[in-house]
Amino acid sequence: MSDSIKIKAIDEVKISRYIIKQTMEDWMNFVENDVVIVGAGPAGMSAAYYLAKHGLKTLVFERRLSFGGGIGGGAMLFHKLVIESPADEVLKEMNIRLEKVEDGVYIVDSAEFMAKLAASAIDAGAKIIHGVTVDDVIFRENPLRVAGVAVEWTATQMAGLHVDPVFISAKAVVDATGHDAEVVAVASRKIPELGIVIPGERSAYSEMAEKLTVEQTGVVAPGLYVAGMSVTEVRGLPRMGPIFGSMVLSGKKVAEDIIKDLRNS
């Protein structure tokens, strides 16, 4: 090796000790949170950005080992996506470059969109942990509310092993899991007292879907919120396809709703 390159020598034991120590410190810190967001797609990461920017302790769980949700797949794997106003203001705030194609309509590169959205959320103070699946919620009575989540390693679930989860508390839980609204679905099935009915997502009607998804983002039951494509599933709205304005605006709106609700609680 060249004498001009001085690489710090660190053995395998130290590597393991540092990783385990710092990881456990993070988990101990994030057992209690202001907000837990399930899903690191465009809505989840937008929500994380605005919540953390406001000073709320925000934790995002993502079952995969990557960011972005549906951004990366784009439209039939094409690497360009559509953003419409006023969502462009959110992307500009995060220094994501846009190409204007007509008044109020922009094209964004999917890789840049994912990377800078994640970086913005992290820089604002949100913690994102990959490879973790949320498979249940915590609830409380008097008053009835959702009070956190149960989590398991995604790899453990994929292996089909019977392993109990650990519990993470939160004043607000956001389902940003996408088309299946997985967290709300579990709460609906296992806590019928919440009175949640899920009509399911409808077929495509982009103009209607973009508007209604943002408008109907918000609380589903005390302590439980929906954002992004989870909104279409829970509210019975149409899908919109590879136009992502409503996703980032939905994330921003759910953050604003939670900030207001926690302030008033």
Swiss-Prot record:
Enzyme Commission identifier(s): 2.4.2.59
Pathway(s) the chain acts in: Cofactor biosynthesis; thiamine diphosphate biosynthesis
Reaction(s) this enzyme catalyzes, per UniProt: hydrogen sulfide + glycine + NAD(+) = ADP-5-ethyl-4-methylthiazole-2-carboxylate + nicotinamide + 3 H2O + H(+)
Gene Ontology terms, MF aspect: iron ion binding; pentosyltransferase activity
Record's keyword annotation contains NAD: yes
Keyword Iron: yes
Signal peptide: none
EC primary class: transferase
Annotated binding of NAD(+), by residue: 43, 62-63, 70, 134, 162-164, 229
Gene3D superfamilies, per database record: FAD/NAD(P)-binding domain (3.50.50.60)
Chain residues that bind Fe cation: 164, 179
Cystine residue pairs: none
Cofactor dependency: Fe(2+)
UniProt keyword annotations, A-Z: Iron, Metal-binding, NAD, Thiamine biosynthesis, Transferase
Cross-referenced SUPFAM superfamilies: FAD/NAD(P)-binding domain
GO biological process: thiamine biosynthetic process; thiamine diphosphate biosynthetic process; thiazole biosynthetic process
Similarity comment text for this entry: Belongs to the THI4 family.
The protein's role, per its UniProt record: Involved in the biosynthesis of the thiazole moiety of thiamine. Catalyzes the conversion of NAD and glycine to adenosine diphosphate 5-(2-hydroxyethyl)-4-methylthiazole-2-carboxylate (ADT), an adenylated thiazole intermediate, using free sulfide as a source of sulfur.
Quaternary structure (record): Homooctamer; tetramer of dimers.
The protein, known as: Thiamine thiazole synthase
Species: Sulfolobus acidocaldarius (strain ATCC 33909 / DSM 639 / JCM 8929 / NBRC 15157 / NCIMB 11770)
The encoding gene: thi4
